[in-house]
Amino acid sequence: AQSVGITEMATMLRDDLRALGFQEAEVVPTDGHPGVWGYYNAGAPRTLVVYMMYDVQPVEENWRVPPFAAQLVDTELGQVVMARGATNQKGPERAFLNALSSIIAVDGKLPVNVMVLAEGEEELGSPHYGQLVDRFEARLRTADGVFFPFNSQAPDGSIAMSLGVKGILYMELESRGGSWGGPTQAEIHGSYKAIVDAPAWRLTQALASMTSRDGNTIVIPDYYNGIRPPTPEEQRLINALAARGGDERGRASLGVERYIDGLSGRDVLVRQFYHPTLNINGISSGYAGEGVKTILPHRAVAKVDSRLPYGLSPDTALARIRRHLQANGFGDIIVRQLSGYPAAQMSVEAPIIQAALSVYRKYGITPTLAPRLAGSAPFYQFTERLGLPLLFSGLGYGTGAHAPNELMLVRPVAGSRVAGLAEIEKSYVDLLFALRSAAPASRR
């Protein structure tokens, strides 16, 4: 996400695909970070697209080990590889490539044709992934489904499998001194607040105008319009999830004592999957260091994201936000869209989903199925644009994505129900062979 090592990583992935015997493997330029394309022609009737990402989040302080050394560390769960990208997303992706290598070593070729389309900007909101899809669209449309290798197990070995993702609108809102007031060139002495407007106050007031006082309900006109309610299939999944309970467990995992508005049970799930959010990631203005410095800053900036349920597009959401600010006297607030894409949704009946469920049954696992993930990924490029079903799931446990000490479990302790690296790779082998005999994907 900081444009460090991008060319090296793209080249490494391309070379890995070539080493596996992919007949096509190339680094593909975009207007941003390059993508990587690979094609393995097994002469098979089924074709699988594999979505990959080779970029990672920045590293922070408080790491137990050097974040890019990929050291093995012993924990109470077993031996883990601890590194930035261990679980998000290089660990599962390398395990998948290892599975391909094993099949080729034993059988001489893969059971399905494989297309790899990787990006280096997922952590930036995938602003140029569409250019990669443009380049290979005709060939991608011939595929039967899409797979994103993913560590889905909890520490107890259970799996929560999601059938979709929310979309996202990521924005930067800025207030600067101008004709409305405030210093226009640079910060000034704080004593002048007696006679000069403050961009920092103006920005916070503009932000506050968009939600209820507690920040939990979006009050922008029409913002909830167009959101598709749960289908009958999704209602059944929600009811099954709610019947399992888990409010206390969920709060503990997030480190919170209560959900907003005192939500519990089924209401938590509906709110999480079917309501949009408006979240302030950070606000910066003026001086926030140690000691005392009295200034009136000339600008203030907020990073804001809105998670978008199925039916609310980023373009529509952005237009409604701008219209609201203008109507409420905040037309001077600068709104810059940094990234955005719509939601994606799959059916549990899709052949690739059914193939995954059959593999999990082989390992004695019955996944918990959720209509969608509350997070976001650019899967709409496949599900909505190309009409391809997509699976993002897999054996394996990891934690700490976007945080210090990110890890992926590779050798579980005795008696653990979590898959280690070898079992993860075996499950990917099983999935590829299950896909070989799966029914053709239906086209939307």
Short names for language-model regions:
Residues S306-P309, I334-E349, R372-L373, P378:
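A short beta-alpha structural unit
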Residues A1-E60, R299, K303, T316, ...:
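N-terminal helical capping/dimerization or prosegment-like subdomains
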Residues P45-A118, A414-R417:
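Active-site metal-coordination/substrate-binding segment of hydrolases
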